[in-house]
Amino acid sequence: MNENLFTSFTTPVILGLPLVTLIVLFPSLLFPTSNRLVSNRFVTLQQWMLQLVSKQMMSIHNSKGQTWTLMLMSLILFIGSTNLLGLLPHSFTPTTQLSMNLGMAIPLWAGAVITGFRNKTKASLAHFLPQGTPTPLIPMLVIIETISLFIQPMALAVRLTANITAGHLLIHLIGGATLALMSISTTTALITFTILILLTILEFAVAMIQAYVFTLLVSLYLHDNT
Amino acid sequence: MASVVPLKEKKLLEVKLGELPSWILMRDFTPSGIAGAFQRGYYRYYNKYVNVKKGSIAGLSMVLAAYVFLNYCRSYKELKHERLRKYH
């Protein structure tokens, strides 16, 4: 049971070949493109959803920030679809791997911060000191703000990893508990099953929310820096 | 009237059972051939189930069901030990 719990998080390798590449590339199959004005239902639904999300997310940015639209929209689609696909039985979720989330968070955060430093150096440096701080506190506050700046990519990555991993672990554990309880006491098993259903609903929500939060935070870092 | 269609151009359902090995060996196994096969398969599925006037949830669900099945096959080795048996 102990070893079983975490084997579902190991990267899938078949005969030494990285199967994980295929799994990471799979969500792209589910988003077909269409050049038509009136396309099929599937593509129309996706385009409508994408327009909704992009309007809501990119409206706060100026024209320089809006050049990042493609990046942020593909980010939210990728994280959302990968998380939702991970809720299917037996599937592997790439976003449970810290390496992958770091690979997404660090370049995006660094891009936003470096853009800010290159184009608006004074304003970016001014972010380190909130307005209206008493003079004796200034050195300490600059240090604290620097630390909080450098912790941003780590927080982005670890937040996503921890949330998705914890959710999957809880589902495994409670599902196992329901199965084990069925032969002992059916009522308790039913209660546990209800908990499992609620948890699954929560996981669906978390899958989408985490994608949203990740993208929102990157866009906030961008907004600060453009 | 004896118009013999060469083996290479016959479709799979027209190939006789005895000719099957040679038909398989004649297929195009170059990288571009394999890529072409995947592309043809993808568009066959897409145009039959998704790119239609009244597409339903079945087009997407069949893909997800196949994904679940493939993942089950992939992790069968670990799942073998979780069967309800007295002796594993």
UniProtKB/Swiss-Prot annotation, chain B:
Cited function: Subunit f, of the mitochondrial membrane ATP synthase complex (F(1)F(0) ATP synthase or Complex V) that produces ATP from ADP in the presence of a proton gradient across the membrane which is generated by electron transport complexes of the respiratory chain. ATP synthase complex consist of a soluble F(1) head domain - the catalytic core - and a membrane F(1) domain - the membrane proton channel. These two domains are linked by a central stalk rotating inside the F(1) region and a stationary peripheral stalk.
Family to which the UniProt record says this protein belongs: Belongs to the ATPase F chain family.
PANTHER family: ATP SYNTHASE F CHAIN, MITOCHONDRIAL-RELATED, ATP SYNTHASE SUBUNIT F, MITOCHONDRIAL
Modified-residue entries (N-acetylalanine), positions: A2
The protein's name in its UniProt record: ATP synthase F(0) complex subunit f, mitochondrial
InterPro entries according to UniProt: F1F0-ATPsyn_F_prd
S-S pairs: none
